[in-house]
Design a protein with these regions (language model features):
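Short, well-ordered strand-loop elements centered on a beta-strand within folded domains, enriched
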Residues: 32-36, 68-76, 89-90, 177-180, ...
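Short Lys/Arg-enriched alpha/beta "domain-start" segment
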Residues: 1-47, 143-148, 152
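Cytosolic ligand/metal-binding cores
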Residues: 37, 53-56, 65, 185-229
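Short, flexible beta-strand-to-coil junctions
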Residues: 25-32, 61-67, 171-174
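Non-catalytic accessory segments adjacent to catalytic cores
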Residues: 39-143, 216
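SIR2/sirtuin-family catalytic core signature
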Residues: 147-192
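A short, Trp-centered hydrophobic/proline-enriched beta-strand micro-motif
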Residues: 20-27, 133-135, 165-170
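Short, flexible loop/turn elements at secondary-structure junctions
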Residues: 63, 139-141, 172-174, 185, ...
Length: 229
C-alpha cells in the first residue's frame, strides 16, 4: 500500500472503533475510492422504500425490508477522510437505533447450519419439481478474527484485486462492518435513460482480462437472469 493508503487505514479503523457511520466505495474501473461520513446525529432507519424519495446518502438495504430489519441511510455530511480521527466526537445512539442493533446481532447467533439445511431442502425441492429454473442460496460462515486484522486494509486489497467490480466498506453502529465486491450494476443512468445488467455465470479472469468466450452453462445462467429482468 502507499503511504496515503496506510494512513487512511489507521483513520478508518479508528472510525469503526469510535462507532462513526461512514461508507467507502470504489466504482469499476476507477482509480480512487469515494468516501462519505455522517458527522452528527443518528443514521436514518427507513421502513418503506418510498421513504427514500428526496433523500441523499449511502443506502444499506436488506433483500426484504421489515420493521426489524429496515433500510439504513448514511447522510453524507463529509466527503473527505478526516486527517485525524482522534478529535471526532462519537455520536450517541437513540433507543430505536440500539434496539435495531440488538435485533441484528441476535439474528446472527441463530443456528446457521440448521437454518441453511431447511432452506436448502426447500430450494432443491422447487428445482426438482421445475417450479423454478434457477435459485441462488447464500450461506453464512463465522470465523475468528485474526489479531491486527484491518477492515480498511482489506478494502484496499479488494480494490486492487477486483478491478472490474464495485467494492465497498461501510459501518454503522446498527449494522456493524460490511464489506463486499460485485461486478453487477443493478441500475445506472441519468436524464431519463436508465440501464441494468443481466449478469450471471462464474468465470475467472484470463491473464488479468475479462473472458471473451462463454460456455453453454454460463450462457444458460445469463439467459435466466435476462428473462427475469
Amino acid at each position: 500500500m502507499t503511504l496515503e493508503e496506510t494512513n487512511n487505514c489507521e483513520i478508518i479503523d479508528e472510525l469503526i472503533r469510535q462507532g462513526r457511520s461512514f461508507a467507502m466505495y470504489r466504482n469499476p474501473g476507477e482509480e480512487e475510492p469515494h468516501f462519505l461520513m455522517q458527522t452528527c446525529g443518528e443514521v436514518h432507519l427507513i421502513r418503506k422504500m418510498e421513504d427514500l424519495n428526496g433523500r441523499t446518502g449511502f443506502v444499506i438495504a436488506p433483500f426484504r425490508v421489515t420493521p426489524q430489519c429496515p433500510i439504513i441511510l448514511i447522510r453524507p455530511d463529509c466527503h473527505e477522510i478526516p486527517s485525524c480521527a482522534g478529535n471526532l466526537h462519537t455520536p450517541a445512539q437513540g433507543d430505536d437505533a440500539a434496539s435495531y442493533g440488538q435485533q441484528f446481532r441476535s439474528d446472527r447467533s441463530l443456528g446457521a447450519k440448521k437454518a441453511y439445511k431447511a432452506c436448502f431442502d426447500v430450494f432443491i425441492r422447487a428445482l426438482r419439481e421445475r417450479t423454478f429454473d434457477k435459485l441462488v442460496l447464500s450461506r453464512r460462515m463465522t470465523v475468528r478474527r485474526e489479531p491486527g486484522f484491518s477492515p480498511a486494509a482489506a478494502f484496499y486489497r479488494a480494490c486492487r484485486r477486483y478491478i472490474y467490480s464495485y467494492v465497498y466498506l461501510c459501518y454503522t453502529p446498527q449494522t456493524g462492518v460490511w464489506m463486499g465486491s460485485t461486478p453487477e450494476i443493478i441500475l445506472s443512468g441519468e436524464k431519463g435513460e436508465w440501464n441494468t445488467v443481466a449478469l450471471a455465470g462464474t468465470q475467472s479472469l484470463q491473464n488479468g482480462e475479462l473472458p471473451q468466450q462463454w460456455d453453454e452453462k454460463n450462457r444458460e445462467e445469463q439467459e435466466y437472469v435476462a428473462a427475469y429482468i
